[in-house]
Amino acid sequence: MILFPAIDLKNGQCVRLEQGDMDRATVFNLDPAAQAKSFAAQGFEYLHVVDLDGAFAGKPMNAQAVESMLQVVKMPVQLGGGIRDLATIEAWLGKGVSRVIIGTAAVRDPALVKDAAKKFPGRVAVGLDARDGKVAVQGWAESSEVTALEIAQRFEDAGVAAIIFTDIARDGLLKGLNLDATIELAATISTPVIASGGFGSIDDVKALILPRAAKLAGAIVGRALYDGRLDPTEALALMRRAAAA
């Protein structure tokens, strides 16, 4: 079980959105590299980064900020947002990104996911962001007609490293992860599932280490860290104790 601190990039700055709304963005750090170093110093072992502008534009828009983070931290980085073709995937992996996250293209171009997962084993994840049960695309601005489970099942045998499941309705609101839906998804597929959206406090960490969440591969935490609602030392210690038990 991995706890991923999140850095969302908008105009080169670290921000947090509420329910995926770009007009409801709060800037938390003007220097993404400094934020990445801070998370590394706190003891986190894997960084989750999203290029929000890229998710809307369909191509990388915060490359300089991402590259600055890659230069200052040694921990692995998974990156999503605006990754829609094999050339972009290859470029990011070549620059030091450990794992890319394919979101919109997983819905619109499933062959890309399969080709990328085959070419780069263990380095391709799929991001499924759901609103009212349906997967949203294009930076959450548009809704599709397919469910997260339907998309996840498409890639069962593709060698995808992980499914990152986000409940958009909870994202950035600190009301707690939607563990029921995430655990249900994890129980239905063999691909590792990472929970995202709504992480609010140490109570979410306690819920993640319960036996019913044993199939989950991790969770992404954002605003709770920036707001100081989650003590990283306490959270990581709790997860380490659970792993050793």
Curated annotation (Swiss-Prot):
Pathway in which this enzyme or protein is active: Amino-acid biosynthesis; L-histidine biosynthesis; L-histidine from 5-phospho-alpha-D-ribose 1-diphosphate: step 4/9
Gene3D superfamilies to which the protein is assigned, alphabetical: Aldolase class I (3.20.20.70)
Catalysed reactions, as listed in the record: 1-(5-phospho-beta-D-ribosyl)-5-[(5-phospho-beta-D-ribosylamino)methylideneamino]imidazole-4-carboxamide = 5-[(5-phospho-1-deoxy-D-ribulos-1-ylimino)methylamino]-1-(5-phospho-beta-D-ribosyl)imidazole-4-carboxamide
Keywords: Amino-acid biosynthesis, Cytoplasm, Histidine biosynthesis, Isomerase
CDD domains: HisA
Broad enzyme group: isomerase
Family the UniProt entry places it in: Belongs to the HisA/HisF family.
Protein name in the entry: 1-(5-phosphoribosyl)-5-[(5-phosphoribosylamino)methylideneamino] imidazole-4-carboxamide isomerase
Organism: Rhodopseudomonas palustris (strain BisB18)
Gene (UniProt): hisA
